[in-house]
Design a protein with these regions (language model features):
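Transmembrane beta-strand segments of Gram-negative outer membrane beta-barrel proteins
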Residues: 1, 22-41
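Outer-membrane beta-barrel porins/channels
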Residues: 4-5, 42-54, 62-279
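Outer-membrane beta-barrel pore proteins
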Residues: 2-8, 14-27, 70-76, 122
Length: 279
């Protein structure tokens, strides 16, 4: 939101700019809940996909994203705090018989981020902040194994499911500059977090030997993007403020995701590549 790295109006500044804790009272607690409802609709323009011909439903759905933050002053210039949130994730879910079910039926990514932080008021003009981020990611991906059935290989009637998770670390840093009694400038950076997900790829369909043949341990690597925020706030009078933000997110870090088998006769083979093309 506008001015997020410069406002420092409650404990959620731990996420946007930890240096902002030096603007808070001795102890502050902040909590919130964001409701997100994305929409993903597909329109077929004449593709041919074997026996899969069902229409696509809207893959979006409601998701609740909670957050909570606590900060407290150790002395007049040194503050510590901790934040808990869910910075990345959501769910896409189509009906099981839709036209593109060999590509995706359901994709569910959840993250939880715990962010202990510290802030130091260097002088009346400059404050600095630093935080560590422990992040857990859990992913589930469901699709049909293929678009057609063949003798002994009922691809279109078999579901392939990936379930994987990982814990990883990142960091964030920020600076707050009080230029005048009415004007502040904030700069913050959150690092990339690289997740090496490990889990299982399982098949579920009408022929047990085929289910076993496509099942294995699996892994995937996802590098969540880093972010920069530069914010400014200027108090015009007792009732009005001007706030502004320039932010950048390095989405190109998620170019593609290779799901690799790590056990069985096909160990080392790529089971599927998810091309994201984020820019």
């Amino acid at each position: 939101y506008a001015g997020s790295a410069a406002v420092g109006e409650n404990a959620s500044t731990i996420y946007f700019n930890p240096a902002g804790m030096t603007l808070l009272q001795d102890r502050e607690f902040s909590a919130g809940l964001s409701m997100v409802r994305p929409s993903f609709k597909f329109k077929d323009k004449g593709s041919s996909t074997g026996i899969l011909t069902g229409k696509a439903s809207d893959a979006g759905g409601w998701a609740a994203l909670p957050n909570a933050y606590l900060s407290w002053a150790l002395d007049k210039d040194l503050y510590v705090g901790v934040g808990i949130g869910a910075p990345f994730g959501l769910v896409t879910k189509y009906n099981r018989g839709w036209l593109g079910s060999a590509h995706s039926i359901e994709f569910d990514i959840k993250t939880i981020n715990i962010n202990p932080s510290i802030a130091w008021r260097v002088n009346d003009t400059v404050s600095l902040g630093f935080g560590l981020n422990w992040q857990r990611m859990e992913a589930e991906y469901l699709r049909r194994a293929g678009t057609v059935n063949a003798p002994g290989m009922p691809l279109a009637s078999t579901f392939a499911k990936l379930k994987a998770d990982d814990d990883s670390w990142g960091w964030n840093v920020g600076a707050l500059f009080t230029l005048t009694d009415a004007t502040r400038l904030g700069i913050s950076y959150r690092s990339k977090i690289k997740h090496k997900l490990d889990g299982d790829l399982t098949g579920k369909g009408p022929i047990a030997p085929f289910n076993a043949a496509i099942s294995s341990d699996a892994k995937a690597t996802v590098e969540l993007p880093d972010t920069w925020i530069i914010s400014a706030v200027h108090k015009l009078d007792s009732r009005w403020e001007l706030l502004g933000d320039v932010s950048w997110t390095g989405w190109s870090s998620i170019d593609k995701v290779d799901i690799k088998r790590t056990s069985g006769p096909m160990a080392g083979a790529i089971a599927q590549t998810l091309d994201t093309d984020f820019r």
